[in-house]
């Protein structure tokens, strides 16, 4: 079969195929893949907030809980609680759902 006969079919496949850039941008990422994607593709040298949980913290959700009450040192506790919530959003959005690698709100 002559190659020129297949060219229109190839052109249709290219036009109707998915946009490769768009297919790469939205992905399910978990664990080390999420960390690498945030570091290499999104945040770079700025870095991002990430503290992996130990097995004990995963098994016992009360470990590391912070109260947001007033009192001495409450400002640092509130900051810690907000950072933990921020990390939870990263994991929730990129592991359970689909996250966009263009979203830089995960960066420091």
UniProtKB/Swiss-Prot annotation:
The lineage of its organism: Eukaryota, Metazoa, Chordata, Craniata, Vertebrata. Transmembrane segments: none annotated. The keyword Lipoprotein does not apply. One of its GO terms (molecular function) is hormone activity. One of its GO terms (cellular component) is extracellular space. Belongs to the insulin family. Disulfide bonds join 30-94, 43-107. It comes from Rodentia sp. Insulin decreases blood glucose concentration. It increases cell permeability to monosaccharides, amino acids and fatty acids. It accelerates glycolysis, the pentose phosphate cycle, and glycogen synthesis in liver. This is Insulin. Heterodimer of a B chain and an A chain linked by two disulfide bonds. The keyword DNA repair does not apply.
């Amino acid at each position: 079969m002559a190659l020129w006969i297949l060219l229109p079919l190839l052109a249709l496949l290219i036009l109707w195929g998915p946009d490769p850039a768009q297919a790469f941008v939205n992905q399910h990422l978990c664990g080390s893949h999420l960390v690498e994607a945030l570091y290499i593709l999104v945040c770079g040298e700025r870095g991002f907030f990430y503290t992996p949980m130990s097995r004990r913290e995963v098994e016992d959700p009360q470990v590391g809980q912070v109260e947001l009450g007033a009192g001495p040192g409450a400002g640092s506790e509130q900051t810690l609680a907000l950072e933990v919530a921020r990390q939870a959003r990263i994991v929730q959005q990129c592991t359970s759902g689909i996250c966009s690698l263009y979203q830089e709100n995960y960066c420091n």
